[in-house]
């Protein structure tokens, strides 16, 4: 386990990498003894640093929700990160690609809470009861650490991603909000178009068998830290497509069927 000073030092390095748009070496290469607990401690330090600068916590994200992604990361559960106020982008926006380092798009559903949600023993039924509405969402993910180390060619590990706020960089909400019991959430599907070509398709059941399962998992995961999910918070439930890279000039349109669509362009 790393000490608090080291957690803070790493958090400042990640913060500088985000601001300068220059990736740093994977943390797991600099600190091979790092643990999952260390990685979340670094993430908390980084989020605290941003809040001290005036940012506001607006919710949370859940990542690594598919079995394939968990296996590739050598973990057996998802990860999570924080959503801050400056991460939210309007549907239909022109997004400066220079705001990010290596941006990618993921297709998700967002749960907007009406009631507090607290673990342990939180279930999918508690999530339904606490949710005000569910709305289509795109997550913009980024990497402040190298995916592959330029010197050793070693790939980054899950410790690096968790420390890096679970790779979160932006959120776009759009389409039509629905009440939790309005549709069978498992069967909500989406088509992701990049420049008019379908690049990814997916169905929401790909997220832990049901997209609300991730929200329950998060409430239970945060309970030991005496943290609950608060009314008004936005929870990204996890991606049901693979991430698609975004470059300058790319236009994205994601069609959620009768739940509407979300669009953006990178400039």
Say what each PLM segment does.
Residues 238-242, 246-254:
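Low-complexity, intrinsically disordered Gly/Pro/Thr-rich segments
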Residues 2-209, 251, 259-267:
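Catalytic-core "active-site belt" of small-molecule-metabolizing enzymes
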Residues 225, 230-233, 250-252, 260-262:
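A short pocket-lining beta-strand/turn micro-motif at the edge of beta-sheets
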């Amino acid at each position: 386990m790393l000490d608090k000073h080291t957690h803070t030092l790493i958090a400042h390095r990640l913060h500088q990498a985000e601001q300068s748009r220059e990736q740093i070496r994977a943390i797991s290469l600099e600190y091979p003894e790092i643990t999952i607990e260390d990685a979340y401690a670094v993430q908390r330090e980084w989020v605290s640093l941003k809040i001290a600068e005036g940012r506001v916590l607006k919710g949370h994200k859940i990542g690594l929700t598919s079995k394939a992604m968990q296996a590739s990361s050598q973990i057996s559960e998802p990860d999570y990160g924080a959503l801050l106020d400056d991460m939210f982008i309007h549907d239909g926006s022109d997004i400066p690609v220079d705001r990010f380092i290596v941006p990618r798009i993921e297709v998700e559903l967002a749960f907007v809470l009406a009631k507090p949600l607290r673990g342990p023993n939180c279930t999918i039924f508690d999530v339904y009861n606490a949710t005000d509405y569910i709305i289509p969402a795109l997550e913009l993910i980024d990497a402040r650490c190298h995916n592959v180390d330029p010197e050793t060619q070693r790939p980054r590990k899950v410790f690096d991603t968790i420390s890096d706020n679970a790779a979160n960089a932006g959120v776009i909400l759009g389409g039509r909000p629905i009440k939790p019991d309005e549709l069978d959430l498992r069967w909500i599907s989406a088509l992701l178009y990049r420049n008019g070509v379908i690049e990814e398709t997916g169905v929401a059941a790909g997220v832990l068998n049901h997209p609300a399962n991730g929200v329950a998992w998060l409430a239970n995961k945060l309970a030991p830290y005496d943290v609950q999910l608060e009314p008004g918070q936005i929870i990204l439930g996890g991606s049901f497509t693979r991430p698609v890279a975004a470059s300058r000039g790319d236009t994205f349109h994601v069609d959620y069927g009768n739940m509407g669509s979300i669009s953006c362009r990178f400039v």
